[in-house]
Structure formats: C-alpha cells, structure tokens
Curated annotation (Swiss-Prot):
Keywords: Aminoacyl-tRNA synthetase, ATP-binding, Cytoplasm, Ligase, Nucleotide-binding, Protein biosynthesis. HAMAP family: Ser_tRNA_synth_type1. GO terms for cellular component: cytoplasm. Its EC number is 6.1.1.11. GO terms for biological process: selenocysteine biosynthetic process; seryl-tRNA aminoacylation. It catalyses: tRNA(Ser) + L-serine + ATP = L-seryl-tRNA(Ser) + AMP + diphosphate + H(+); tRNA(Sec) + L-serine + ATP = L-seryl-tRNA(Sec) + AMP + diphosphate + H(+). This is Serine--tRNA ligase. The gene is serS. InterPro entries: aa-tRNA-synt_IIb, aa-tRNA-synth_II, aa-tRNA-synth_II/BPL/LPL, Ser-tRNA-ligase_type_1, Ser-tRNA-synth_1_N, SerRS_1_N_sf, SerRS_core, tRNA-bd_arm. GO terms for molecular function: ATP binding; serine-tRNA ligase activity. L-serine binds at T242, A243, E244, E296, S396. ATP binds at R273, S274, E275, E360, I361, S362, S363. It comes from the Bacteria. Belongs to the class-II aminoacyl-tRNA synthetase family. Type-1 seryl-tRNA synthetase subfamily.
Length: 435
C-alpha cells in the first residue's frame, strides 16, 4: 500500500500521479478525514498532557498531608481518562476510514511508464527472433496434442470441469522438462535459490502481496476446516494464484541485514485462478486455465537497487525464451494495463503461430515498497539503527503451459511431429521429437 504520509503531505501531487492510471483519488473525503484526524490528535495530546501535569500534583499533596485534595485530583484524572478514551476511539475510527481508502489505492507508476488506457497503449521495447514461415497448413496446440494423444481436455472436463487439462506420455514429460530446465537455469546460472512452498496460504499472506482485500473473487478459497486444533478457530485458506504470494511473504515481518540483499528466490508451483471476468476468452486450449504451472522469480532488494534488478530479472526470463529459440517481444506496460501493486512492469510476449500474434508468457514487475509496507518487510543498513522497507520484485520465468503451447506450435513439422528444443532433449531422455 502507499505511504499514508503521501496522502497527508502531498495529497494533490499523489492524486495527479494516480490519475495517470485512470484512478480517481477522493481528495475531498481524504482531506476532510485528515483534518478530523489532526483535530482529534491535538485533543488527545492535550488531554494526555493535562493528565500528566495534574498527576504530578498527587504526590505533592500527599507529601503535604492533604489527602482530601489528592483524592479530588484523582477524581479529576479519572474524568480526564474517560474523556481521553472517548477521543482515542474517535481517532481510531477516523484512522480506520483512512486505512480503508489507502487499501483501495493502487501503486504510483514510475515516471517512465507511458500513459494509456489498456494493452493497446503498451510500448514495444524490443523483439527477439523471427517467426518461422511454414509451407504446410498450421495446426494449433490443441490439434497437435490430440493427434499425439497427449492433451486430453475431455477427461479433464469429466473429472473437474472446463479450463483444466490431462496430459499424457511425452506431452506430460515435456511439461515436466520445461519446468525442470527453467529451475536449473535460474538456480545454476542466474543465482536464485530454489524454494518449495505451500500451495495454500492464509489471508495475511494474500494481504501482504496485494490480492486481498480487492481481488478475493479471483481466488479459490477453501471452506473453513471442521476439525480444530485445540481451541483454534477454523482457518479459511486459499489456493495460491502465483508462487509470488508464498515466496514474497517469506520476508513478511522480518528485518534483513543489508549484506544479505538482494535475496533471489525461485519456485515451481501450480497456480490456481478463478478467471473471474474472463468468460468467453481463450476458451480453447492451454492459454487460460484454472490450474497451470509456473516458475516464479522473486527478488528482495534495497530501494536504490530495484530498478536495475527489474532489468536483470526480466533478462533472466528472456534468457529462457532465447535458449528455447522462441520468438518474442518485450513491452513496457502503460499506466492503464499495469497490475494493482506495480510501479513498473515489462511483459514478454511469445509468438503463437496458430493465432498469428504474440501472447503474454511472462510479466515482470517492480512493486517498489508497496508490498513491503503491507508486509512490514524491512532491512537495516550497516551502522544504522532504524530499519527501512525493502523493495520487492517478481516475474514469471516462465509460465510452463504457455511455454509448451509456444514449443508445440513453433516447432511443428509437416508430418505432425514436434521438434524438441535442443536444451530440453537431455530432460527428454535424448529424444529429438515428439510423435
């Protein structure tokens, strides 16, 4: 969340920056609440000061033997205490209203982020690789998977429902190989530590990374557990929409040493999304699923290092595509297409031949101190007593299912076989083709 000081001391400037995102900050309401807060705060401080001053008189009166006078002072202090309690309740109520507003406010975009309404206003930064030309009729990944008896959507519908998949044989192995290759690359060459994390998280974790309270409808939630451990309340947990949630929350409520930063972590997990609001979009194939695998990259940095870290992290995701020899483009998201908590985001879009277009395969974001403030994730500089908020970054390195789509479609041959990228062949038992 944003620093509340910005809303107290730079309200108009903050509103103007948020307006670039198409977000209208309720300046009038915030201004009124801030005036109330300051007024009540002054009353609280005056009451505390008066109470403290009068309290000193009790000892003096008792020393002088004036018990009656001391008793009157005690009654006066009791009355002041009651007034103080009332004012504290009023102050808490105003602060709660301000907090509710702050939680609904997105992050401020970086100055270099282009203004825009949606994906059509994103800025293309670069392209890598050239889409192939084919002298035969292209098939999409669904047809290729069904021809090879490797993608079984019908069984998934029977077992669960739409937007799920059953993979078999060499297709399942390819899916596993892609994830293993990504993990090996990021841990052995890019300096990340592999993490195994829970796939179910609590509300505090989802709040920390910004999914709650605003985006609860996008998640799959468990029902409260009926079994209780001792006298604990039943827990409501949620399936992770991305490994960003559990991995980033590893630094929640912690103070890291400056020497330990940056922290670079990666995890391969399934991800679960309800895809609320996407009815009718990408209903065919693996592009938009309720359950999909992803290798996530997370970095925790010092504030002055986070922008360079974003370039590095994005480059790590790009390296995966380059080694797989998949054409892609890199775009800088405009203000209207950025995620709620993002300060700056690059998307990588891979070429999908059957759709004759580029599709998102990775989103790499610098969240600035937005998540860190929610999580109270801090670090302490050498020689300093007061800790500072870290900066958090995350990105897909990559989405496994969409990578598989790109491999199947870009590497298809006239006879329906799929050429396995060279870097994956050792994970496929030396096979060069599927089919």
């Amino acid at each position: 969340m944003l620093d509340s000081k910005l809303l107290r001391t730079e309200l108009d400037e903050t509103a103007a920056k948020l307006a670039r995102r198409g977000f209208k900050l309720d300046v009038e309401t915030i201004g009124k609440l801030e005036e109330q807060r300051k007024s009540i705060q002054v009353e609280v401080e005056n009451l505390q000061s008066t109470r403290n001053s009068i309290s000193k008189q009790i000892g003096q009166l008792m020393s002088a033997g004036d018990k009656e006078g001391a008793e009157k002072i005690k009654q006066q202090i009791g009355s002041l205490g009651s007034d103080l309690d009332v004012k504290k309740i009023e102050l808490d109520a105003v602060m709660a209203q301000l907090d509710d507003i702050i939680l609904s406010v997105p992050n401020i975009p970086a100055d270099e982020v282009p203004n825009g309404k949606d994906e059509n206003d994103n800025l293309e930064i670069s392209r890598w690789g050239e889409p192939k030309s084919y002298d035969f009729e292209l098939k999409d990944h669904v047809d290729l998977g069904e021809m090879g008896d490797g993608l079984d959507f019908a069984s998934a519908v029977k077992i669960t429902g739409a937007r799920f998949i059953v993979m078999k044989g060499q297709f399942a192995r390819l899916h596993r190989a892609i994830a293993q290759f990504m993990l090996d690359l990021h841990t052995e060459e890019h300096g990340y530590t592999e993490m195994y994390v829970p796939y179910l998280v609590n509300a505090d974790s989802l709040f920390g990374t910004g999914q709650l309270p605003k985006f609860g409808k996008d998640l799959f939630h468990t029902e409260p557990l009926t079994e209780k451990a001792s006298d604990e309340e039943p827990r409501k947990l949620s399936l992770i929409p991305t490994a960003e949630v559990p991995v980033t929350n590893l630094v929640r409520d912690t103070i890291s040493d400056e020497a330990d930063l940056p922290l670079k972590m990666t995890a391969h997990t399934p991800c679960f999304r309800s895809e609320a609001g996407s009815y009718g979009r990408d209903t065919r194939g693996l592009i938009r699923m309720h359950q999909f695998d992803k290798v996530e990259l997370v970095q925790i940095t010092k504030p002055e290092d986070s922008m360079n870290a974003l370039e590095e992290l994005t480059g790590h995701a790009e390296k995966v595509l380059q080694l797989l020899e998949l054409p892609y483009r890199k775009v800088l998201l405009c203000t209207g297409d950025m995620g709620f908590g993002s300060h700056k985001t690059y998307d990588l879009e891979v070429w999908v031949p059957a759709q004759n277009t580029y599709r998102e395969i990775s989103s790499c974001s610098n969240m600035w101190d937005f998540q860190a403030r929610r999580m109270q994730a801090r670090f302490r500089r050498k020689g300093e007593k007061k800790p500072e908020l870290v900066h958090t970054l995350n990105g897909s390195g990559l989405a496994v299912g969409r990578t598989m789509v790109a491999i199947l479609e870009n590497n298809q041959e006239a006879d329906g076989r799929i050429a396995i990228p060279t870097v994956l062949q050792k994970y496929m038992g030396g096979a060069t083709h599927i089919g």
